């Protein structure tokens, strides 16, 4: 009987602890128009969600006078109406699956400030046709452009020290390794 009461007390404590954590996470999300965001430890902003239905989306450079530096994990997940998105140069990080299943997104120009593109950042973007990757990108996560059925062109600027492109295909800098062979490219072969 004592063991049963002890187990019930532990279970009750665990439920309360989980509820407190969930409330703390929910309390951290703020809204700015259709954007959900959080303020990071360094005082900059991470976009954590989007609730709009616009086709063309402009991510603000600042929210409440704080620079937007990150597009968070899953931030635009399933935003199927977006056809184009503009991000400010202040963005340095695009998170894991940030644009997952944005099926109407046609093209994306990664801002010059971006250093890292997370795992599967643009996965399942069936409408995506082209991507431009700037000089400052040092890391592109695995599967960043997986299942983008119409993707035919990944362009890397000449000044990028880590990546290059040829015929729309994404390579490491010295072209010894294919990083991403776009699904929409037909009749091009590499050996």
Regions found by a protein language model. Name each.
Residues 1-6:
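N-terminal secretory signal peptides that target proteins for export/translocation
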Residues 11-23:
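Bacterial N-terminal signal peptides
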């Amino acid at each position: 009987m004592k063991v049963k009461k002890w187990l019930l007390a532990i279970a009750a404590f665990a439920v309360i602890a989980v509820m407190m954590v969930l409330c703390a996470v929910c309390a951290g999300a703020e809204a700015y128009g259709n954007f959900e965001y959080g303020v990071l430890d360094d005082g900059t902003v991470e976009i954590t969600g989007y609730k709009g239905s616009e086709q063309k989306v402009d991510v603000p450079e600042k929210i409440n006078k704080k620079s937007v530096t990150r597009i968070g994990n899953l931030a635009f997940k399933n935003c199927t109406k977006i056809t184009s998105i503009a991000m400010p140069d202040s963005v340095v990080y695009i998170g894991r699956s940030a644009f997952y299943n944005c099926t109407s997104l046609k093209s994306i120009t990664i801002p010059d400030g971006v250093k890292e593109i997370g795992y599967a950042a643009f996965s399942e973007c069936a409408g995506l046709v082209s991507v431009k990757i700037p000089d400052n990108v040092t890391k592109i996560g695995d599967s960043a452009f997986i299942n983008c059925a119409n993707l035919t062109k990944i362009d890397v600027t000449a000044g990028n020290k880590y990546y290059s492109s040829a015929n729309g295909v994404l390579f490491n800098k010295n072209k010894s390794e294919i990083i991403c062979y776009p699904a929409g490219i037909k009749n091009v072969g590499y050996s």
